[in-house]
Regions:
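Cysteine-clustered segments with highest specificity for TGF-beta superfamily mature ligands
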Residues: 223-226
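Chitinase-like catalytic core of GlcNAc-active glycosidases
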Residues: 2-185, 189-211, 215-220, 231-245
Length: 247
C-alpha cells in the first residue's frame, strides 16, 4: 500500500474514480445558502438528499464551496453549520471538503469541522502568488491566516493546495509558486507535511508539469496528489502518477 493519497474531484455523482484513487470528492456545492450545486436560482444536486456513492476502497466526501461559490462569509449561523453536518452524517458521506473561494467564515468553518468529527474534513484553497506573497495583498494575508488558524485548531485532516487556474499554470508560475506554497504551508503555517495535498488539473497537463508536481510530492514527502475534474485525466498520465507514487 502506498504512503501517498491519490484522489480528486468530480461534478457528477455518476462519475466513478479510476483504480488507484482512495479519496473522491463530489461537488461543487457552490450554492452555500441552499447547499446545492449550481446556483440559488438554478440549483443542481444536493448532499442533503443524496447518499454518498459507494466506491470500494474510497473515502467519498462532498465539497462545500468551489469556484463562484456564494454568498461570502459562510457559514453564518448555527443552523447553517448544523445543516452541513447533518448532510454528511445522515447520508453516509465520509466527510466534507471545504473549497474556500468565497471568503468563508473561518471561525464557523472550524466549528463545522469539529462538529463533523469523526468524519474527515479538508480545507482547499488557491496556493498561488497571493498566498506566497501575503504582504502584497489583503487576500493573500487572509488565506495564510485561515490556513494557520485551521491548523492551530487541529480541525482539518488535510489541506489541499490548488496550484492551477482554468488550466495548469505556466512553467514560470509553477517554478515560482508550487514548492514555495508547500514550504509556506508546512514551515510558516504549521501544517504537518502528510496533511498537505498538492492539486492539479488535467487541462494543460503535460509531461513536464506533471512530473514537476510529482517531484514536489516526493521531495517534501507530503500527503499526496488530488486531481480536479478527474474524468478528464488521461490514462497515460494516471499511469505515471501511480508509478511514481507507488500506487
Amino acid at each position: 500500500m502506498s504512503e501517498y493519497i491519490l484522489g480528486g474531484w468530480a461534478q457528477s455523482l455518476a462519475d466513478t474514480p479510476p483504480a488507484g484513487f482512495s479519496h473522491t470528492m463530489y461537488g461543487m456545492v457552490t450554492n452555500l445558502a441552499g447547499l446545492t450545486t449550481g446556483t440559488e436560482t438554478a440549483p443542481g444536486w444536493s448532499p442533503t438528499n443524496n447518499k454518498a456513492p459507494k466506491i470500494p476502497g474510497n473515502d467519498v466526501l462532498w465539497t462545500y464551496g468551489g469556484g463562484l461559490c456564494s454568498p461570502e462569509s459562510m457559514p453564518k449561523t448555527s443552523q447553517q453549520i448544523s445543516d452541513i453536518v447533518a448532510a454528511a452524517k445522515d447520508n453516509d458521506w465520509a466527510g466534507v471538503d471545504f473549497d474556500d473561494e468565497c471568503n468563508m467564515n473561518i471561525d464557523n468553518l472550524i466549528d463545522t469541522m469539529q462538529q463533523l468529527k469523526p468524519l474527515q474534513t479538508s480545507y482547499t484553497f488557491i496556493a498561488g502568488w497571493a498566498y506566497n506573497n501575503p504582504t502584497a495583498s489583503s487576500n493573500g494575508q487572509a488565506i495564510n491566516d485561515a490556513v494557520k488558524k485551521i491548523s492551530n485548531a487541529g480541525a482539518a485532516d488535510r489541506f489541499a493546495l490548488m496550484c492551477y487556474a482554468t488550466e495548469m499554470w505556466s512553467k514560470a508560475d509553477i517554478e515560482a509558486n508550487v514548492s514555495q506554497a508547500i514550504e509556506r504551508t508546512i514551515n510558516d503555517n504549521g501544517v504537518a507535511a502528510k496533511s498537505v495535498i498538492l492539486a492539479l488539473t488535467p487541462e494543460g497537463l503535460d509531461d513536464w508539469n506533471l512530473n514537476y508536481f510529482l517531484d514536489q510530492v516526493l521531495k517534501y514527502d507530503i500527503g499526496g496528489l488530488y486531481v480536479w475534474n478527474f474524468p478528464l485525466l488521461k490514462g497515460a498520465d494516471l499511469n505515471v502518477i501511480k508509478a511514481r507514487l507507488g500506487i
